Amino acid sequence: MPIIKIRDNEPFDVALRRFKRSCEKAGILSEIRRREFYEKPTTERKRAKASAIKRLSKKLARENLKRIRMY
């Protein structure tokens, strides 16, 4: 859990913004959303495999686009 120390003469809004930013960097909200409902291990593996395939296809598309621009 991210911890921030409130500085002297620091407005509450600024401290809250710093806390939200540190939570975002730590990935707490995405972790909570991911664990909100139980997901079967097979479904979890299937989702991970699908995201890996999607990442790979994006990478290949970017590399292919670079090759086309060279000529």
Swiss-Prot record:
Gene3D superfamilies: Ribosomal protein S8. Keywords: Ribonucleoprotein, Ribosomal protein. The keyword Cytoplasm does not apply. Coiled coil: none annotated. GO terms for biological process: translation. GO terms for molecular function: structural constituent of ribosome. The keyword RNA-binding does not apply. PROSITE patterns: RIBOSOMAL_S21. Signal peptide: none annotated. One of its GO terms (cellular component) is ribonucleoprotein complex. Belongs to the bacterial ribosomal protein bS21 family. PANTHER family: MITOCHONDRIAL 28S RIBOSOMAL PROTEIN S21, SMALL RIBOSOMAL SUBUNIT PROTEIN BS21. This is Small ribosomal subunit protein bS21. It comes from Buchnera aphidicola subsp. Cinara cedri (strain Cc).
